[in-house]
Each structure stands twice: as structure tokens, then as C-alpha cells.
């Protein structure tokens, strides 16, 4: 009798724990962040293709798309373009691009985007005309409010000297931010020295003209927009019940996937303190952006890793990054077929690499684990909605 009673208690405890786990997973807020990096967007494009493929297998649904699983998708520069590709609706109100169409997009359009050189020493390297043309063709007249999930795309206004963040949740208070997606994508990609800044105008809530003079989102958020994406999610938590679980920065209730476009330590090997002590403004200008982006990206990852670890939720955060790019793969604008093939291979090889020195789990294994959580969470929410 005592044995039977103990067995029943054990069963109740297991069921209670399982129920609690499911409830916790159902409450999770999911965030995807994609770095900037020009043609190096092929690397996260490869990762996204793998992840979406896993979700399709797990849910036995060839039409499953990343926007179905993430509450917030944020990106900067080329990451902003990827964000738009996987969240902008087509005529069937589904993402106009599947993840397996991202890498082919770079191969088809990259050589044209990064080939229209102005030839001006004192002007931008590329005129941006083809980039705008293809963005208008792909994104049409779609505006922010039509995105299939919350987005967070950054840019910087050089007239007001302030960052501009395009999100759906800001539109009620700032309807002027409901810009066309092609204007936003060009703006977030308009890296100084590479493309001309972008001007466009919308209307305020009073119908007044509102002007934007924008450049690359990396100026506002550096190349890694993970903190921005998390901030958008936590801000929505104050108003949207679906995000309520992460109020008060409860990162235990957040799944964050951050995708990098690769970095390198090559410049560290070629410059010394003795050498750079003789440098002037021009020499520093050639490398300071690369150094700043690498350092800022590292600090963003360091902060997020620390926060999630302190909350014993380190498995809720995954940063996918290649830290050993070499040669032409370090360049954001080398759209030669040979280099793009190398970048695609970098993405494929990255899947087989360990997450870190302390974590032997490969990125492929970690992404499969993330995919399982995303799939289970979606099913739990769908079941709840059906009652």
C-alpha cells in the first residue's frame, strides 16, 4: 500500500513538473537577431536555411517559415535586408522569401550591387542604384505594419543625429515610422563610404511631412543588433500580453538566437603599438571601423552571455559566429563568385564547429535543440488557441 502511494506521488510530481515545463515553454518570447556585413550575409543566410529546414522536418510542413516561430526578428545593414526578406508578406500573406532563397539572392544580385562603382575618390564607392532597384522589385509597396511578425531594423538619421528604429510596436505613437520596406532596407544598408545616404519622407499623425536622412544601421547599433532586438521585445512586454513573461527583464523566459556575419583577427596580427604610434587620421580611418565593430560585437555577446548565465539560462542564448575569417572573406563588398562560394562554405563549415571552447556542442546540434524548442512552443500555443 505504501509502495502504491509512493508511486502515485511520484507520478503526480512528474506530471506537475512536465506541466510546468510546457507552461514555461509556452510563455517563452523568441528573438532572432542578424548582424550586418554586406555580402557576408551569406553566412547567416546559410544558418537560417539550416534552421528553417529543421523546423519544416519537425513540423512536417514544407511551408513553415521562420516568421512563424519568432516573436521579434531584428537586423542591421545586410541583416536588415534578411529581416525584410523573411518577414515581408507576398500576395498570399506568407514571407516572400524562404530561407533557402537567401544565399541565391546574394549570388544573383550581389555582383550588380557591388559593381556599380562611382569611381569617385571623394564620393561613395557604389551608387546604390541597383540596390534600390532590386529592393523595390522584391518588396514592392509593403510597409512596416504589414510585416508578419515584430521587426527591429535600425538606421541613423544624419540630420537629427539620432538612431531611427523601425518596429511595428512604435507605429501607434509614431506613425511616421510606417515607411516602405524598400526605403528602410536601403537606409539600413547605406554604409558610409559604400553607398549614398538615403532621403525619403512620410507623414506624421497630423498629416505633416516627416523627413528622413538615413545611413547604415551599424552607425546606430554597431553591426550586432542583438541588444536592440531584445530591447524591442522587452518594450513590447509593457503593452502586449504575449510578451508579459519577460517583464522586468526576465531573460529566463526568452530564447535569443544571434547570427553573426563573421569576424577576423587578421588586423591584430599586422599592426603593432610601435607602428600605429606614427599613424595619422587617414591610416586610422582605414581600420578603425573594423576594430570598433569587432570590439562592439564582442562586448554585446559578452554582456548577453553573462546575463543569461547569471540567470542559469545559458541554453536560452545562442550566438552563431565565425571568428577566423581570412583573405577575401573578410571583405563586405567582394561579390565575386569565388568569394561568395567561400562564404557559403564558411557557413556550412560553421555548423560543424563547437559553440565554444567550454561547450563541445556543435552549432548544428545547438540549432537543432533551438528548433525543437521553437517547434514545441508553436504547437503549445496553437493547442491553447484551439480551445
Swiss-Prot record:
It is found in: Vacuole. GO terms for biological process: defense response; lipid catabolic process. Tuber and stolon. The active site is at 77 (nucleophile), 216 (proton acceptor). InterPro entries: Acyl_Trfase/lysoPLipase (IPR016035), PNPLA_dom (IPR002641). Glycans are attached at residue 115. The keyword Chaperone does not apply. Pfam families: Patatin. GO terms for cellular component: vacuole. Probable lipolytic acyl hydrolase (LAH), an activity which is thought to be involved in the response of tubers to pathogens. This is Patatin group A-3. One of its GO terms (molecular function) is nutrient reservoir activity. Residues 1-23 form the signal peptide. A motif (GXGXXG) lies at residues 36-41. Residues 32-230 form the PNPLA domain. It is an enzyme of class 3 (hydrolase). Patatin have a dual role as a somatic storage protein and as an enzyme involved in host resistance.
